[in-house]
Design a protein with these regions (language model features):
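Alpha-helical scaffolding within the catalytic cores
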Residues: 46-54, 82-88, 114, 176-179, ...
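Flexible loop residues that form catalytic
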Residues: 13-15, 68, 133, 196-197, ...
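Conserved, mostly hydrophobic/aromatic
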Residues: 11, 55, 87, 119, ...
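Active-site gating/metal-coordination segments in enzymes
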Residues: 61-62, 67-160, 164-166, 170-173
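Catalytic pocket-lining loop regions of alpha/beta-barrel enzymes
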Residues: 122-127, 136-244
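Conserved phosphate-coordination/catalytic loops
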Residues: 42-46, 78-81, 110, 138, ...
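Mid-to-C-terminal alpha-helical segments outside catalytic/metal-binding sites
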Residues: 2-62, 118, 238-244, 252-283
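Short aromatic-enriched loop/helix-cap "lid" or pocket-rim segments at secondary-structure transitions
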Residues: 18-23, 75-78, 113, 170-172, ...
Length: 283
């Protein structure tokens, strides 16, 4: 669509062949669940310029690259252990196109907080991304509170996967209602519940309605499959300021084309795919 604003994707991964090969090898010996087998591997690009070309073709201005830390629920090791340098290869060479989100390991709190502070203050990262499930603690566990306090200090948001998890680990610890505790205990912390919160969509919507500091992530789903409750929310007076768009590696052009087909008001679409991300992450 020619009048579509340049989009900002708030959820992506390191997508180099080297990283994907490392991730594929790490999953050997892990239990792979039915959905993960059906969907397949994360996307990869032969080079970052190739990725930029695809972004340009789709009308995507910026992509957030997450330093994802994923703990194995079964084998108790960091089987997705994205290094800061793997994100920096995007953000330092192409700072106008890529935004970094640091990772957090609640089992290595001191080291994690030091790396987060370095990522934000030295390298310009704009927040932190958390994949909680394999750690087998809920989002409002006290091991998470040092992270939330640090992000208040640094004035950056925390993005957390909320809802079910694709990988072979229980989903309960990512329930969106746990953001209710965090928002109450850290009213100055900007929180993003990513991945729509499904199957607890209404929980995430309720928390976003209640708190000024919680945002709704419309990512990891092709928009044509979004529940009507989500579409109604992001098209509503109170919801249109709280929702941000991302892909989690799904194809940009198809996703944005499907956003165009949701019947959103023009201002709601503009805020969803661009303006709200700029506000949330202070771009």
């Amino acid at each position: 669509m020619s009048d579509r604003p340049k989009a900002i994707d708030i959820m992506y991964y390191v997508a180099t062949p080297e990283f994907i090969a490392k991730w594929t090898d790490a999953k050997k010996g892990e239990l792979i669940c039915r959905m993960e087998r059906a969907i397949g591997s994360l996307p990869q690009f032969e080079s970052i310029p190739t990725m930029l070309t695809k972004m340009d073709e789709a009308g995507v201005e910026k992509v957030f690259i997450t330093q994802t830390k994923m703990w194995s629920y079964w084998n108790k090791w960091m089987y997705m252990d994205t290094q800061l340098e793997e994100v920096l290869q995007y953000t330092e060479k192409y700072p106008d196109r890529f935004v970094g989100l640091a990772g957090y390991n609640p089992f290595r709190i001191k080291e994690s907080l030091a790396e987060i502070e370095r990522a934000v203050t030295k390298h310009g990262f704009k927040g932190v991304y958390v994949h909680i499930y394999g750690f087998d603690i809920p989002l409002h566990d006290k091991k998470m509170y040092p992270l939330y306090a640090k992000c208040v200090e640094l004035d950056v948001p925390v993005s957390v996967q909320a809802g079910h998890v694709l990988e072979s680990m229980p989903s309960e610890h990512g329930r969106p209602i746990y953001l209710d505790y965090i928002a109450a205990d850290f009213p100055a912390l900007r929180l993003l519940g990513a991945h729509t919160g499904w199957p607890w969509v209404e929980e995430l919507i309720s928390v976003c309605y209640k708190w000024d500091n919680v945002w709704f992530g419309v990512d990891a789903w092709m928009p044509k499959y979004l529940k009507p409750e989500i579409i109604n929310y992001i098209n509503s007076r109170m919801g249109m300021d709280r929702a941000v768009w991302g892909t989690n590696g799904l194809p940009w052009k198809e996703s944005l084309d499907q956003v165009d087909g949701l019947g959103l008001r023009p201002e709601a679409r503009q805020k969803l795919i661009r303006d709200n991300a700029r506000e949330l992450f202070k771009l």
